[in-house]
């Protein structure tokens, strides 16, 4: 049985009861969002997330490919990408496309971030402006790190303060790396924002989300707004029962 939590006006959480339910919810949400966009606007413009959890979701989506109304109408961008000598080994693009090739999305509708180009961020922003109507994605997938980062928007990095650019290179000193990432201005205007969290290693993060006083705001908490909240999908193992108990009863609802 999933639990719906209204954490605040900008963040709504759905906690799955099992790993299977987590993947089902994430998969059906993705497919229904795609079908709605294709029906209404003729295409589904999505920014994908890197990380292990999205790869599991992609596998489920491919299994349920028949439920997608028209895979040829999917247009794929990325939310962030590594920019170092190990990019091929750790590339979000390569890992995702190894799975998503099963959807047979036209190659000219898949836009990879070119992190080898010193002006690749400007070029990627231009691609978004050219191909995504009004630069509004139908969906942006958001992973969440233990430190509360999302995409490559890490705590105490300069990209957090970007007000105009849609794509930037972001120096991440805590990881000794440089990443290309979408920024808040374009992410916040997406039609559907979804954050995915699973694993016991995220329990401390969930505790801090539930108890926000006395700490800095996490990057992921700066994404949603009351007019466009982030929908979180969490697995039960990412939340301690004691923290769930601390959430007021009128903010929780057992769904199904």
UniProtKB/Swiss-Prot annotation:
Q: Which residues cross the membrane?
A: none
A Pfam match is Glucosamine_iso
GO molecular function, one example? Answer: 6-phosphogluconolactonase activity
InterPro entries named in the record:
6-phosphogluconolactonase_DevB, Glc/Gal-6P_isomerase, NagB/RpiA_transferase-like, PGLS
Q: What class of enzyme is it?
A: hydrolase
Q: Tell me where on the tree of life, at the top rank, the source sits.
A: Bacteria
Entry keywords, A to Z: Hydrolase
Reaction equations catalysed:
6-phospho-D-glucono-1,5-lactone + H2O = 6-phospho-D-gluconate + H(+)
The EC code for this enzyme is 3.1.1.31
Instruction: Give the GO terms filed under biological process for this record.
Output: carbohydrate metabolic process; pentose-phosphate shunt
Its pathway, per UniProt, is: Carbohydrate degradation; pentose phosphate pathway; D-ribulose 5-phosphate from D-glucose 6-phosphate (oxidative stage): step 2/3
Instruction: Please describe what this protein does.
Output: Hydrolysis of 6-phosphogluconolactone to 6-phosphogluconate.
The family database entries (NCBIfam families) matched by this protein are listed as: pgl (TIGR01198)
Q: Family membership, please give it.
A: Belongs to the glucosamine/galactosamine-6-phosphate isomerase family. 6-phosphogluconolactonase subfamily.
Q: What is this protein called?
A: 6-phosphogluconolactonase
**What taxonomic lineage is listed for the species of origin?**
Bacteria, Pseudomonadati, Chlamydiota, Chlamydiia, Chlamydiales
């Amino acid at each position: 049985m999933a639990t719906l939590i209204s954490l605040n006006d900008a963040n709504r959480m759905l906690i799955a009861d099992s790993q299977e339910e987590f993947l089902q919810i994430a998969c059906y949400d993705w497919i229904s969002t795609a079908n709605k966009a294709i029906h209404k606007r003729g295409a589904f413009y999505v920014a994908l997330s890197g990380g292990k959890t999205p790869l599991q979701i992609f596998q489920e989506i491919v299994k349920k490919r028949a439920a997608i109304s028209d895979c040829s109408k999917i247009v794929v961008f990325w939310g962030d990408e590594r920019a170092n000598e190990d990019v091929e080994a750790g590339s979000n693009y390569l890992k995702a496309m190894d799975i998503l090739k099963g959807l047979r999305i036209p190659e000219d509708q898949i836009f990879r971030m070119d992190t080898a180009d010193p002006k690749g961020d400007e070029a990627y922003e231009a691609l978004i402006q050219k191909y995504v109507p009004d630069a509004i994605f139908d969906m942006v997938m958001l992973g969440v790190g233990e430190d509360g980062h999302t995409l490559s928007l890490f705590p105490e990095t300069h990209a957090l303060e970007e007000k105009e650019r849609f794509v930037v290179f972001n120096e991440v000193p805590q990881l000794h790396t440089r990443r290309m990432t979408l920024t808040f201005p374009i992410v916040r205007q997406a039609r559907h924002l979804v954050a995915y969290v699973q694993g016991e290693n995220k329990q401390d993060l969930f505790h801090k989300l539930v108890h926000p006083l006395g700490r800095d705001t996490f990057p992921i908490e700066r994404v949603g707004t009351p007019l466009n909240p982030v929908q979180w999908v969490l697995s039960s193992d990412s939340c301690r029962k004691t923290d769930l108990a601390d959430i007021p009863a009128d903010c929780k609802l057992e769904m199904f």
